[in-house]
Amino acid sequence: MKLNTLFNLNGAKKCSKRIGRGIGSGKGKTCGRGAKGQKSRAKVARGFEGGQTPLIKRLPKRGFKSMNKRNYNIINIITILRLVKANKIEYGAVIDKLLLLKLKMLKKSINKIKLLWANPSSLVLSSEDISLLTKLDLQFNLDEYSISARKNIIKLGMKVINN
């Protein structure tokens, strides 16, 4: 068996009907669209409901896009801790946008970065984790900090460079 000798069985592949090729073809003249009218001339517009007010116009307008919305890349202290444990952040490092981009921790570089402290109900920092963070003497140079993040960073002896 060779590729150039293969062929379809009879009736396996049906050719499409060629329209507009004369009355004898079975789909000539009006090409199966019938005589006159909107659907014979062109397609009906998307959303057109036959003269009835379309659904999109019947529904009320809702919401808007705020011009003053702040887009943040959210970084949690747990993420920083994981990077420290993986030896990607060394002693005395300045954690800023460039470092986080280099480590591929940010989705978009245009957004501001906000540091959050671990949520006490779900992500609890152990005493080992806290001692590890204090030994490293990290410095944070980010755009925003949650209130608890700023408070705990200063409490643990790390530095907040800006703000």
Curated annotation (Swiss-Prot):
Keyword presence, Metal-binding: no
GO cellular component: cytosolic large ribosomal subunit
Assigned keywords, A-Z: Ribonucleoprotein, Ribosomal protein, RNA-binding, rRNA-binding
GO biological process: translation
Disulfide-linked positions: none
A GO term for molecular function: structural constituent of ribosome
Residues in coiled coil: none
SUPFAM superfamilies: Ribosomal proteins L15p and L18e (SSF52080)
HAMAP family: Ribosomal_uL15 (MF_01341)
Assembly and interaction partners: Part of the 50S ribosomal subunit.
NCBIfam families in UniProt: rplO_bact (TIGR01071)
Role this protein plays: Binds to the 23S rRNA.
Matches recorded under PANTHER family: 50S RIBOSOMAL PROTEIN L15, LARGE RIBOSOMAL SUBUNIT PROTEIN UL15M
Family: Belongs to the universal ribosomal protein uL15 family.
Official protein name in the record: Large ribosomal subunit protein uL15
Encoding gene, per UniProt annotation: rplO
